[in-house]
């Protein structure tokens, strides 16, 4: 894939091909790591049901913590990529923005992961610890040929707007410079400003799905705009796993990301 021409590690390239579509060179990832931060939310109480639904809808990968994989994160259905999330923190912690490392790259490999991910809150009081973790783990990933996704979120006492183009661009660039192969970050809300974020980041950017939107059309239009601005995919959790038609909304996202269909056409995939 052209966007990964700078990566010479064969192991990384093989794994990246499992989570990125070879034709579109984009990805649709469904994060389901929310159980650690927020508890057993609706939609992920039984991860196997949701994993099967998003796999049937065409998603490229699911993302979750190691425990769910060991307990069985899927039941039947088509193959789907697996991303192991290495960071943890809870909403009931004295410092919800602090994320700590709870597994290893080697453990993720033993579970058959196609990539690992880390969460970094840029601007948090403990952000320097997360930067150190990202930098060190990127070296381990390079050694083992494991793709690394950095979730780079502007979040902390000095962050007034988490979608501010300047802070989003800074967060994305920071993740790339510390060794991430793929950056997940906020969409700025505007294609023109997001283009500048993409220009300033040497690693491909996948947008976060964000909080649950009011309408499917609003959400899908955001995905459409981000792809046209240079985004290389979407990683959306709640807007997918809490949808009434999980398979349908996943298929709608895939239609936009991989086939560049219009929002009106993609909405036809949703049956409920």
UniProtKB/Swiss-Prot annotation:
Residue positions binding 1-deoxy-D-threo-hexo-2,5-diulose 6-phosphate: 33-37, 153-155, 209-210, 237-238
MF (Gene Ontology): fructose-bisphosphate aldolase activity; hydro-lyase activity; transketolase or transaldolase activity
Q: What happens when the gene is disrupted?
A: Cells lacking this gene require both aromatic amino acids (AroAAs) and p-aminobenzoic acid (PABA) for growth. In the presence of PABA and AroAAs, growth of the mutant strain laggs about 30 hours behind that of wild-type strain. By complementing the mutant strain with the expression of aroA', the strain grows in minimal medium with acetate only. Aryl acids do not replace the requirement of AroAAs for the growth of the deletion mutant strain.
Entry keyword set: Amino-acid biosynthesis, Aromatic amino acid biosynthesis, Schiff base, Transferase
Please list the disulfide bridges.
none
Active site as annotated: 33 (proton acceptor), 153 (proton donor), 184 (schiff-base intermediate with substrate)
Which Gene3D superfamilies does the record associate with it? Aldolase class I
Give the catalytic activity. 1-deoxy-D-threo-hexo-2,5-diulose 6-phosphate + L-aspartate 4-semialdehyde = 2,3-dioxopropyl phosphate + 2-amino-2,3,7-trideoxy-D-lyxo-hept-6-ulosonate
Which PANTHER family does this entry report, sorted A to Z?
Answer: 3-HYDROXY-5-PHOSPHONOOXYPENTANE-2,4-DIONE THIOLASE (PTHR47916:SF1), FRUCTOSE-BISPHOSPHATE ALDOLASE CLASS 1 (PTHR47916)
Job of this protein: Catalyzes a transaldol reaction between 6-deoxy-5-ketofructose 1-phosphate (DKFP) and L-aspartate semialdehyde (ASA) with an elimination of hydroxypyruvaldehyde phosphate to yield 2-amino-3,7-dideoxy-D-threo-hept-6-ulosonate (ADH). Plays a key role in an alternative pathway of the biosynthesis of 3-dehydroquinate (DHQ), which is involved in the canonical pathway for the biosynthesis of aromatic amino acids and which is also a precursor for the biosynthesis of p-aminobenzoic acid (PABA) in M.maripaludis. Does not possess fructose-bisphosphate (FBP) aldolase activity.
Name of the protein: 2-amino-3,7-dideoxy-D-threo-hept-6-ulosonate synthase
Gene behind this chain?
aroA'
């Amino acid at each position: 894939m052209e966007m990964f021409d700078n990566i010479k590690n064969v192991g990384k390239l093989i794994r990246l091909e499992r989570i990125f579509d070879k034709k579109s060179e984009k990805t649709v990832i469904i994060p389901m790591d929310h159980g650690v931060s927020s508890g057993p939310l609706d939609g992920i109480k039984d991860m196997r049901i949701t994993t099967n639904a998003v796999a049937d809808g065409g998603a490229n990968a699911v993302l979750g913590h190691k425990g769910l994989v060991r307990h069985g994160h899927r039941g039947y259905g088509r193959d789907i990529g697996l991303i192991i999330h290495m960071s943890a923190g809870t909403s009931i912690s004295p410092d919800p923005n602090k994320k700590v490392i709870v597994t290893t790259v080697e453990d993720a490999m033993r579970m058959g992961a196609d990539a690992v991910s880390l969460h970094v809150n840029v601007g948090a009081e403990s952000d320097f610890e997360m930067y150190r973790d990202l930098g060190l783990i990127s070296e381990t990933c390079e050694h083992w040929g494991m793709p690394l996704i950095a979730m780079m979120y502007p979040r902390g006492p000095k962050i007034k707007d988490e979608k501010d183009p300047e802070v989003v661009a800074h967060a994305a660039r920071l993740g790339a410079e510390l060794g991430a192969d793929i950056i997940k970050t906020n969409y700025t809300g505007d294609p023109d400003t997001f283009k500048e974020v993409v220009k300033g980041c040497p690693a491909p950017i996948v947008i976060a799905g964000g909080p649950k939107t009011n309408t499917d059309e609003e959400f899908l239009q955001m995905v459409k705009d981000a792809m046209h601005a240079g985004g290389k995919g979407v990683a959306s959790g709640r807007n997918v796993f809490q949808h009434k038609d999980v398979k349908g909304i996943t298929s709608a996202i895939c239609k936009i990301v991989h086939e560049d269909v219009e929002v009106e056409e993609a909405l036809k995939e949703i049956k409920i």
